[in-house]
Amino acid sequence: MLHIYDVVLEVIASLRGPLAQIERRDRDLGRQLRRASASVALNLGEGMYSRGQLRTARYHTALGSMRESTSCLEVARAFGYLGELDAELLAKLNHVTGTLVRLVDGPR
C-alpha cells in the first residue's frame, strides 16, 4: 500500500471542521468538497491494485479530485466561509498533490 493513502485519510479527517463550516453556509459547496475528497481516497485505493494504464488513469482522477478539493477550500475562503486554513492541513494538501503528480508523470 502507498504511504500517501494514509496521508489522504488524515486530510479527510482534518476536513471535518472546515467541511462543517462550509456546509452551514453553502450545502452545495460542502457536498462538492465531501465528494471530491472521498474521490481522492477511492481512486487512489483502486489505483494501488490496478495495473498499467488503468492504474495511471485512477491516479490521474485522484489528482484531479485533489485539486478540486483544494479549490473548494479556496472558494470557501474567498466567499468568507472559512478563515485561514491550518498550516499542517495546507502542507498535507500540497504533499498529496505533489505525490499524485509524480505518480501520474512517472519517474523523470
Placement of each model-derived feature along the sequence:
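Amphipathic alpha-helical assembly/interaction segments
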Residues: 1-108
